[in-house]
């Protein structure tokens, strides 16, 4: 009979239908595979593959096609090769037809096979053409087809040639080789990428992601990312090295899609009217939602991301199919090893199939993980953008129900939890399928004995849930202590000036360390329970196996234990164990994600600003009225009562309307109503023209001065200079280190309160708006600056003349210059008219003026512009040799400051920055950091831990080896003689492993807790001992990051990563030992694999560490921008800057994604390549076993191969654990950063020059005293020599930046003297410890400070006084009745920093605290500047009663406060300009007289 005529045509007819034909005699010993099997597979598998997937693929590219590709040389070559294959197969079809026509009988298969291949090749060529039409540059379907066409027919061709079948027909021989060559060429070409489309929709980015240019094999194994990993290995990665973000991953695209679907889902909600209208009660509305609102958000997310999720799910299902194929193949392989008569080709085939199944499982699983991680990234981006856009439209009522920290918590915690849950969603149903398949496998292997596995498995589940519940209780306790510690640490760092001024560091350190001790105690208990949980997970496979083996061997009739039963059971139980551990974890993560999802949905449903609350127009109509309110009634939210009633108001063009009234009258609410921020109950509001708004509490961004003022408008340099000079900022900016490019820090930390308010005013003025709404912008300015700003900006001749201005003010002396005055009382308009008209009416305005009880022109609520100036208090930025101008006239021509500003604009880096940026670490972590951590753990404990890990791994190895010996025991009459002994020893080894595992893990966690405690104590001590200048240069956020995030990393992450690294590393050694012991020949292949492993590890670790650090830094900027926008959303809306802020947020998110995407790709690159290496180790173990079959037992082979099967995960987790550990070790490095900074003087001196009762008199003497706030700055105080007598009351006055507060700082040694010294009662203060000095002086600052804790703790931090003494002090400051009315009285818990108390009440409590100290020296640093006149009178009365015999230094802006002082010091440019009694200084008509004249006192 004629032989086959095609590449797939059989060389001879098969004997029957069995492809595993063992009756057919093999032609030669070197034939490894059954010819019948190979012929069948090569004939039908490739065509079936393409006809199943081809139509689906064709439909997909038809729906998702892009622009067609160029007719490139690659495409032409593919088509030519395809047509050549069609011609060859046409020839193969024609030959049998011609022979039939000639009367030569032909077997049907000789015609069917070539015909099938002809149609299949035609279809493949058609797909090549359609791919070009639809823009497909690399095809996975065709790559798989050509690969199958190469492998299966290739094997058939080799066997046909080796059997000599081609010698009979040379022509067929040549045709077959030609076909195979063409297919190989097609395979090679499918590994290449075609040219980009003709008309690309997207512009080409600078550094495009190479994924688009990658071939299918490169995409499957993530080789396209190798370039970035190589760059990261060779050098430090920078922003230019990161790939540009594709449009499909950009914030603009993702957020717009989700927002569109979210609005669509919300349209169906009852009561929805185009914007969210869910009420916002005055509670944590979105933290504890009363009803679930997740439905619309869930539908929106599903519509946007379902295709990506479903494709990833399909990859996971296929991966699991191959996962369960491996145990079946292992079973067949061990059966082959146990059968000495089996053919060699069976072993080779099974080894190849195990390797192929493991590789396919790896590739599909990693594709699932890749898509899941990309989906996580996209979901996080989309929901974060949705939350940000919601922040920009939140109503005032909704904002009151939340805080910036809550929103940041949504972004950093809840969105992260929701994104992470994507991976676990499929676990809710797929794990049950795992469990079912595992039990089916066990039943096939062990029969009814497998039911015991069910019993043990079910009994372990309650144990895990119990441990999880108990651990959760201790974790909650740890979180409570951590929250308490965080609150106290934050309060301590934000009020460090007050703490150091009073010498309270020890008290706070003791409180913090006590809380820290409780936190670590809960952490230790939690980690010990975690160790038990981990041991139960690790040992559960052993427990189930022990019970199953014992029942099977001791109860069942056929109780022989062989290698197949033993090691296949262990492999299946390993899969079952993963399901057992993963299931509760998945449920826990999904439950947490559900809570977070509810919080997010509730937040997104909060009440928004009513778009119909105000009718705004930029058109200029004929009406002269810019603002019109008709019968307006407004409320903060739907639940709250109206705050404004019956408002009827019209403001014409160019009018200056002053709004006054008592506290709580509704002045700020009126401005909010005009801005559309309040809920309009009835009436109408109309505004014609653009609006600029200045809030009462200045809001500034963490950017430069020029960016704050320009506020996303084009830079107009002359106008900018004019605005800065008019707002009294010109000289300030000129003295800043980097001029207008000087960063002002987080929340304006580098500026004083007055500077921030003037910057806020400058921002509004720069806009050139038609309407200005000014909410008491003069309150934070001293009298002189207030007058200057009003005259040059707000007043009739200021920059805003001709615009419509509504000025809310408590500065009553400006009222005569207002065009109209509106007096509010209890939310209604009491009266309105000109100043003279209202005086004649003798109404509400006259009552306000009489109630002020101060001369006209006195500033009523000024706050110090001196404390906290840039960069530290005392305004060091104003140089002493530059006199501060008393009036800033409009600039003509090019002034010096304008030239300086222009120079700074040209070179923003010329003078450097002031605040210390939180640095991003680059490169590898130094060895010294690891050694410092290990020293904190303790050398003995480290050695003991390594010994325990070694012992438990020896027990694990012995357990597997003993099981192999058990499986190899001879079977006599269906039984093994020593089965009982084998079982007892197997159980004993498992118990020893469990004990060693628990002990080793507990040692790691307890050692980590010990190291964390020591490192935290060291960090706390280093920060507490730092001088005040360190806190002025270092943002509070940086410090809090060390005490929160970095400390948490040291607490939890480092011990866990170290435990993981040691576990996997020792496990990897066990696998290597098992494989080499069973087949020593494997060492030849293992060594090259280890070289590749080391190479992958080096590339990954170097790059991943850098990417993770960059990602952390980028994401923190997103959170900071979110919090900043939340705090200033009212200003953003008033300036109509929502679009630019949204664009900035999207840009920040995109920058974060530019780091996140390479990071997740690098993770997949590592996992794929290391798992493929692990699969290679399995293949090596199996092939070596086949080669050494003659002298290897099945039990030893099972031990070796089953151990190798577990190494695929172990390889990548060793590297990941090492990388995670290195990333976490950065926290140790950052925690130790502050150990090297200079420390302040000792708190206590062993030989102190002061007596126990020092100072007994209170005499203070300055001798040539000079002080500078930073080494590079000029002297803020210089050449001060004066003596203050005991018991003398001295006032200290001067303009802003004159050095008033600097004298107090020098007296308390908050800043050390640059020259000279200060003596108190004849003792130099440098000879006294800081705490000794500061505890003997009392200072009452301008800003009252309270701390989290009870009222009693706030009054007596050192616990030195009795309750009776505290009540007496409270009675003196007239707060006894108030405190008595509080719940708990002295034990009343203050919220935050006394947020539930008024400013006046907090200041009186600070005064009571000062009374309890009973020191001889008292410093009042503008202590009454921010309180109302009534509170000021109370404070003055208490001071006169308690401090009559004390030396009092009264620092004041308001000269009225120092008129009763015995002596007044007038500071000017850091020197004492004048000194004498108030009457003498007024008579001299010098600087004091000019200040008094400006304040209306002379």
From Swiss-Prot:
Name the Enzyme Commission number(s) assigned to this protein: 7.6.2.-, 7.6.2.3
Annotated positions of the Phosphoserine modification: 1281
Q: Where is ATP 2 bound in this sequence?
A: 1294-1301
Q: Which UniProt keywords apply?
A: ATP-binding, Cell membrane, Glycoprotein, Membrane, Nucleotide-binding, Phosphoprotein, Repeat, Translocase, Transmembrane, Transmembrane helix, Transport
Q: Where is this region: Disordered?
A: 855-910
Which stretches face the Cytoplasmic side? Answer: 59-78, 126-137, 195-300, 369-424, 470-531, 596-934, 1014-1056, 1100-1170, 1215-1498
What does the entry's PTM section describe? Answer: Glycosylated.
Q: Where is the ABC transmembrane type-1 domain?
A: 309-592, 942-1223
Task: Indicate where this protein is primarily found.
Answer: membrane
What is its membrane topology?
A: Multi-pass membrane protein
**Its GO CC terms?**
apical plasma membrane; basolateral plasma membrane; extracellular region; lateral plasma membrane; nucleoplasm
Q: What SUPFAM superfamilies does the record point to?
A: ABC transporter transmembrane region, P-loop containing nucleoside triphosphate hydrolases
Binding positions (ATP 1): 661-668
Gene3D superfamilies (UniProt xref)? ABC transporter type 1, transmembrane domain, P-loop containing nucleotide triphosphate hydrolases
Q: What happens when the gene is disrupted?
A: Deficient mice spontaneously develop calcification and elastic fiber abnormalities in blood vessels and Bruch's membrane in the eye, whereas no clear changes were seen in the extracellular matrix of the skin. Calcification of blood vessels is most prominent in small arteries in the cortex of the kidney, but in old mice, it also occurs in other organs and in the aorta and vena cava. Mice have reduced inorganic pyrophosphate (PPi) plasma levels, a strong inhibitor of mineralization.
Q: Any stretches that span the bilayer, and where are they?
A: 38-58, 79-99, 105-125, 138-155, 174-194, 301-321, 348-368, 425-445, 449-469, 532-552, 575-595, 935-955, 993-1013, 1057-1077, 1079-1099, 1171-1191, 1194-1214
Query: Per the record's keyword annotation, is Zinc-finger included, yes or no?
Result: no
What does this gene product do? Answer: ATP-dependent transporter of the ATP-binding cassette (ABC) family that actively extrudes physiological compounds, and xenobiotics from cells. Mediates ATP-dependent transport of glutathione conjugates such as leukotriene-c4 (LTC4) and N-ethylmaleimide S-glutathione (NEM-GS) (in vitro), and an anionic cyclopentapeptide endothelin antagonist, BQ-123. May contribute to regulate the transport of organic compounds in testes across the blood-testis-barrier. Mediates the release of nucleoside triphosphates, predominantly ATP, into the circulation, where it is rapidly converted into AMP and the mineralization inhibitor inorganic pyrophosphate (PPi) by the ecto-enzyme ectonucleotide pyrophosphatase phosphodiesterase 1 (ENPP1), therefore playing a role in PPi homeostasis.
Q: What is this protein called?
A: ATP-binding cassette sub-family C member 6
Instruction: Record the organism.
Output: Mus musculus (Mouse)
């Amino acid at each position: 009979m004629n032989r086959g005529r095609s590449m797939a045509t059989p060389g001879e007819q098969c004997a029957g239908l069995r492809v595993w034909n063992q009756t057919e005699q093999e032609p030669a010993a070197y034939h490894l595979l059954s010819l019948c099997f190979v012929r069948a597979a090569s004939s039908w598998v490739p065509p079936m593959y393409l006809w199943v997937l081809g139509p689906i693929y064709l439909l997909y590219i038809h729906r998702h096609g892009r622009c067609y590709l160029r007719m490139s040389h690659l495409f032409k070559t593919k088509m030519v090769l395809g047509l050549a294959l069609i011609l060859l197969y046409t020839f193969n079809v024609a030959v049998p037809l011609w022979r039939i026509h000639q009367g030569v009988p032909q077997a049907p298969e000789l015609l069917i096979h070539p015909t099938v291949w002809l149609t299949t090749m035609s279809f493949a060529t058609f797909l090549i053409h359609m791919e070009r039409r639809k823009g497909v540059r690399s095809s996975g379907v065709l790559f798989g087809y050509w690969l199958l066409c190469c492998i299966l027919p290739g094997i058939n061709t080799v066997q046909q040639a080796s059997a000599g079948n081609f010698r009979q027909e040379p022509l067929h021989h040549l045709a077959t080789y030609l076909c195979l060559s063409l297919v190989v060429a097609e395979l090679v070409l499918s590994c290449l990428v075609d040219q980009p489309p003709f008309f690309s929709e997207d512009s080409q980015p600078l550094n495009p992601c190479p994924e688009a240019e990658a071939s299918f094999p490169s995409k499957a194994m993530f080789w396209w990312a190798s370039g970035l990993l190589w760059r990261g290995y060779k050098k430090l990665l920078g922003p230019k090295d990161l790939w540009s973000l594709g449009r499909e991953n950009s914030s603009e695209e993702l957020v717009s899609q989700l927002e569109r679907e979210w609005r669509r889902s919300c349209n169906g909600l009852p009561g929805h009217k185009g914007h969210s209208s869910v009420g916002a009660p005055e509670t944590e509305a979105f933290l504890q939602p009363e009803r679930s609102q997740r439905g619309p958000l869930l539908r929106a997310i599903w519509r946007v991301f379902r295709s990506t999720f479903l494709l990833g799910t399909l990859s996971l299902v296929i991966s699991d199919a191959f996962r369960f194929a491996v145990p079946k193949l292992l079973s067949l392989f061990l059966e082959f090893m146990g059968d000495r008569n089996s053919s060699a080709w069976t072993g080779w085939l099974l080894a190849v199939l195990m390797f192929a199944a493991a590789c396919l499982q790896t590739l599909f699983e990693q594709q699932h993980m890749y898509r899941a991680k990309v989906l996580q990234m996209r979901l996080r981006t989309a929901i974060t953008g949705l939350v940000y856009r919601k922040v920009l439209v939140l109503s005032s009522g909704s904002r009151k129900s939340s805080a910036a920290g809550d929103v940041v918590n949504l972004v950093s915690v809840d969105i992260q939890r929701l994104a992470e849950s994507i991976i676990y969603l499929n676990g809710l149903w797929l794990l049950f399928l795992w469990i079912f398949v595992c039990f089916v496998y066990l039943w096939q292997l062990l029969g009814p004995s497998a039911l015991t596995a069910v019993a043990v498995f079910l009994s372990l589940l309650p144990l895990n849930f119990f441990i999880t519940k108990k651990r959760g209780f201790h974790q909650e306790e740890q979180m409570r202590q951590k929250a308490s510690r965080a609150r106290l640490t934050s309060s301590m760092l934000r009020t460090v000036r007050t703490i150091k001024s009073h010498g309270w560091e020890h008290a706070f350190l003791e409180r913090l360390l006590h809380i820290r001790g409780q936190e670590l105690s809960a952490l230790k208990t939690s980690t010990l329970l975690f160790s038990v949980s981990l041991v139960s997970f690790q040992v559960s496979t052993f427990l189930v196996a022990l019970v199953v083996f014992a029942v099977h061997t001791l109860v069942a009739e056929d109780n022989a234990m062989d290698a197949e039963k033993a090691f296949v059971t262990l492999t299946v139980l390993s899969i079952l164990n993963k399901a057992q551990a993963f299931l509760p974890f998945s449920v826990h993560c999904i439950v947490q994600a559900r809570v977070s999802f509810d919080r997010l949905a509730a937040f997104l449903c909060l009440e928004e600003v009513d778009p119909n609350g105000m009718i705004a127009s930029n058109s200029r109509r004929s009406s002269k009225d810019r603002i019109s309110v008709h019968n307006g009634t407004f409320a903060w939210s739907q639940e709250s009562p109206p705050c404004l009633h019956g408002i009827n108001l019209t403001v014409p063009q160019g009018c200056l309307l002053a709004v006054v009234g008592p506290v709580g009258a509704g002045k700020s609410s009126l401005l909010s109503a005009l801005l559309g921020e309040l809920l309009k109950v009835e009436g109408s509001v109309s505004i014609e023209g653009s609006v600029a708004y200045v809030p009462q509490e200045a809001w500034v961004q963490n950017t430069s001065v020029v960016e704050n003022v320009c506020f996303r408008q084009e830079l107009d340099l002359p106008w900018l200079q004019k605005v800065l000079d008019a707002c009294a900022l010109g000289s300030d900016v000129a003295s800043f280190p980097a001029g207008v490019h000087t960063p002002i820090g987080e929340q304006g930390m580098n500026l004083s309160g007055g500077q921030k308010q003037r910057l806020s005013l400058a921002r509004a003025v720069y806009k050139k708006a038609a309407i200005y709404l000014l909410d008491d912008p003069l309150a934070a300015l001293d009298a002189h600056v207030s007058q200057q700003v009003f005259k040059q900006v707000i007043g009739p001749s200021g920059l805003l003349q001709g615009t419509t201005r509504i000025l809310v003010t408590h500065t009553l002396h400006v009222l005569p210059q207002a065009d109209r005055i509106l007096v509010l009382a209890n939310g209604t308009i009491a009266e309105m008219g000109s100043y003279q008209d209202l005086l004649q009416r003798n109404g509400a305005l006259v009552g306000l003026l009489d109630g002020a009880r101060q001369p006209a022109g006195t500033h009523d609520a000024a706050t110090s512009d001196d404390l906290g100036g840039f960069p530290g208090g005392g305004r060091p930025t104003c140089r002493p040799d530059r006199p501060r101008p008393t009036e800033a006239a409009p600039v003509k021509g090019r002034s010096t400051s304008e030239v300086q500003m222009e120079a700074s604009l040209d070179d923003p880096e010329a003078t450097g920055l002031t605040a210390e940026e939180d640095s991003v670490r680059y490169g590898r972590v130094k060895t010294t950091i690891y050694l410092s951590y290990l020293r904190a753990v303790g050398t003995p404990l480290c050695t003991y831990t390594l010994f325990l890990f070694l012992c438990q791994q020896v027990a694990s190895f012995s357990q597997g080896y003993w099981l192999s010996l058990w499986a190899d025991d001879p079977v006599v009459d269906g039984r093994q003689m020593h089965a009982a002994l084998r079982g007892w020893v197997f159980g004993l080894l498992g118990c020893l492993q469990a004990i060693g595992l628990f002990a080793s893990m507990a040692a790691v966690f307890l050692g980590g807790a010990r190291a964390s405690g020591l490192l935290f104590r060291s960090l706390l001590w280093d920060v507490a001992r730092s001088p005040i200048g360190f806190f002025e240069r270092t943002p509070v956020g940086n410090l809090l990051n060390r005490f929160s995030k970095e400390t948490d990393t040291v607490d939890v992450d480092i011990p866990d990563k170290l435990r993981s690294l040691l576990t996997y590393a020792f496990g990897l050694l066990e696998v290597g030992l098992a494989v080499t012991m069973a087949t020593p020949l494997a060492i030849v292949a293992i060594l090259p694999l280890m070289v590749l492993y080391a190479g992958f590890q080096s590339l990954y670790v170097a790059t991943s560490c850098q990417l993770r650090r960059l990602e952390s830094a980028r994401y923190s900027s997103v959170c900071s921008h979110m919090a900043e926008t939340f705090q200033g959303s009212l200003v953003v809306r008033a300036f109509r800057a929502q679009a630019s802020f949204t664009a900035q947020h999207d840009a920040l998110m995109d920058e974060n994604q530019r780091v996140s995407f390479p990071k997740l790709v690098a993770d997949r690159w590592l996992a794929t390549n290391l798992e493929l290496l692990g699969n290679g180790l399995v293949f090596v173990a199996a092939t070596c076993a086949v080669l050494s079959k003659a002298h290897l037992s099945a039990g030893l082979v099972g031990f070796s191969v089953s151990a190798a099967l577990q190494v695929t995960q172990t390889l990548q987790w060793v590297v990941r654990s090492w990388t995670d550990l290195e990333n976490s070790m950065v926290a140790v490095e950052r925690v130790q950063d502050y150990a090297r900074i200079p420390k302040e003087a000792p708190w206590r001196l062993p030989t102190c020059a002061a007596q126990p009762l020092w100072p007994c008199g209170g005499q203070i003497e300055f001798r040539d005293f000079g002080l500078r706030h930073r080494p590079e700055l000029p002297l803020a105080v210089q050449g001060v020599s004066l003596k203050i007598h005991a018991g003398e009351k001295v006032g200290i006055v001067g303009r802003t930046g004159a050095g008033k507060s600097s004298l107090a700082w020098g007296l308390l040694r908050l800043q050390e003297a640059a020259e000279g010294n200060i003596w108190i009662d004849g003792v130099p203060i440098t000879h006294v410890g800081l705490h000794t000095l500061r505890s003997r002086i009392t200072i009452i600052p301008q800003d009252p400070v309270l701390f989290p804790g009870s009222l009693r703790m706030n009054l007596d931090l050192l616990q030195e006084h009795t309750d009776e003494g505290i009540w007496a002090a409270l009675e003196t400051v007239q707060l006894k009745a108030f405190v008595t009315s509080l719940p708990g009285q002295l034990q009343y818990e203050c919220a935050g920093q006394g947020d539930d108390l008024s400013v006046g009440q907090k200041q009186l409590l600070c005064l009571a605290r000062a009374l309890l100290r009973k020191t001889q020296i008292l410093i009042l640093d503008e202590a009454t500047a921010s309180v109302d006149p009534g509170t000021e009178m109370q404070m003055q009365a208490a001071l006169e009663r308690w401090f009559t015999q004390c030396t009092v230094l009264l620092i004041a802006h308001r000269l009225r406060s120092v008129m009763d002082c015995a002596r007044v010091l007038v500071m000017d440019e850091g020197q004492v300009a004048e000194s004498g009694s108030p009457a003498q200084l007024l008579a001299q008509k010098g600087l004091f007289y000019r200040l008094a004249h400006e304040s209306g006192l002379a």
